[in-house]
Amino acid sequence: DTVAYLKTLPDYVNVKAALSFQKDLSMEELAALQMKDQNSLPILWVAVRNANYYRNAEIGTETTDSSADVTGATVQMNDSFPVQLLPQVGFEPNGTGIYFEQINNSYPNFELSPHLSDTDSKKNGALYESHFQTLLQVMADHPDFLKTLESYESNLSDYYAAVQRFIKANGIKTYGVTVLGSPSEILQFCELAGVEGIFVEELTFSRD
């Protein structure tokens, strides 16, 4: 059990983990969750739902597969969850990195950091939505670049167009996040967020 394992770890260990929510969250709900989290657990990546169908339509679930995280705990994969188009899509919600300022003129809210609020979850939710739509549009506007990334069986231009159609019809929602923090911080966040799945990706010693 991953929760039990995390409880045995000292807080000088940094844990990188992928967390799955019990239900999809809107971008405003995600922003509100970040503000409720007193530990301000760093969210490294927000996974955005890009499809909503099941492989096994008769029973409404996919064929169950399993994997193991770095703790050795068995993690059920694709069990009753809608299939996602690959590659998965998402965004980094903190606005870190170096950008050319001019890019925001063509692609609104490509850069998040100057605009994020410490108190307004509605504003941040709208920014997340705009930012993600912009990221998709950047990819859609550069088909020649996408061709350099394609394997023999993929068409990324069609893929990003499909994702754009999906979020237009269904909204932008997240089914999980990747976080980095101490075991106790992650456990507190899981309780606050209603997390139902934890996949530990990496353990490192904290430098603090």
Q: Where would I find each of the regions flagged by the language model?
A:
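N-terminal, intrinsically disordered low-complexity tails/presequences enriched in Lys/Ser/Pro
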Residues: 1-13, 24-31, 38-49
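Sequence-level detector for tyrosine residue identity
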Residues: 5, 12, 53-54, 99, ...
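A short beta-strand structural signal in non-transmembrane regions
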Residues: 15-21, 177-179
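Generic structural motif
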Residues: 22-26, 51, 182-184, 203
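Extended, H/D-rich, highly charged conserved domains that either
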Residues: 31-36, 40-41, 53-56, 86-88
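Short proline/glycine- and acidic-rich turn/helix-capping motifs at secondary-structure junctions
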Residues: 49-61, 203-208
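Low-complexity, serine/threonine/proline-enriched polar segments
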Residues: 55-151
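Extracytoplasmic/luminal low-complexity segments enriched in Pro/Gly and acidic/polar residues
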Residues: 126-208
